[in-house]
Amino acid sequence: CIATQIARYVAEGNSLPGWHAPEIAWAQTQGQLAYYQAMERAGQMKQIVDRAGLKKHVELWQNNPPANAPIGFVLSLEGADSIVDLSYLERAYATGLRAIGPAHYGPGRYSPGTGAEGGLTAAGRELVKEMQRLGICLDATHLTDDAFWEIMSIYDGPVWASHQNCRSLVPHQRQFSDEQLKELIRRDAVIGAAFDAWMMVPGWIRGKTTPQETGCKIETIALHIDHVCQLAGTTRHCAIGSDLDGGFGTEQTAMDLDS
């Protein structure tokens, strides 16, 4: 699975929740890392940092794993605001960070994200070059359209979209267009389907619409998965992204999800 680190920097006057200094955002992500490391010491998780480790862990789960087999995880950063400067990227890589999504919501230090406009910042372009050098995977989720196409033109390393649905089914900037999905498929990316209800069904109004009103069920996500399969002509690019990480509850998930 993907284990996420996340902490947003916000400038004064920005209404989004976050921290007013990148250094504090960095400290927040290090607390999250400490939790994952504690879970690993307890034998519940196993961090995957290279192909050899991934192969070994997959083999464990494919060959009658014990009941207490640890869950393997790849460490990923959602929104790069907490990377204070590029020297911090080296430090993060040393702790096992293997994927970064430069954007999240609103304006970002490296890239604007959901609800914002524009392309990569100058610092963002340098970040992408350093990701390329280190072999850090690009998570395209949350990128604006402009940032998406810009980054695809300057980065040729591994790509995925960790939690992403289809704009042709749910019209919104947060989803990807067919052209973007085709580009990800061309890049051999994996696209994780997101289970946030407003991304699953059209016309959702946050804080007002309910899953029951829309008939949003777990099976609804199959429409998005199938759409990606039809574009790709194969199932190999589809995964479960979920996004069910505690940021919202059953008021914003499929009506038959009870946990």
Language-model segment annotations:
Residues 1-118, 122, 171-259:
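N-terminal hydrophobic targeting/anchoring segments and the immediately downstream early-domain regions
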Residues 136-143:
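Catalytic beta/alpha-barrel core
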Residues 145-146, 166-168, 197-200:
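Short, catalytically relevant binding-site loops at active-site mouths
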Residues 97-99, 134-136, 154-160, 186-190:
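Glycine-enriched alpha-helix->loop->beta-strand junction motifs that scaffold or abut catalytic
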Residues 29, 119-134, 151-161:
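Alpha-helix-loop-beta-strand connector modules within alpha/beta enzyme cores
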Residues 143, 161-164:
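Histidine-centered catalytic micro-motifs
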Residues 85, 146-149:
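Short, well-ordered alpha-helical microsegments
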Residues 155, 166-167, 252:
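Charged catalytic cores and adjacent phosphate/nucleic-acid-binding surfaces used
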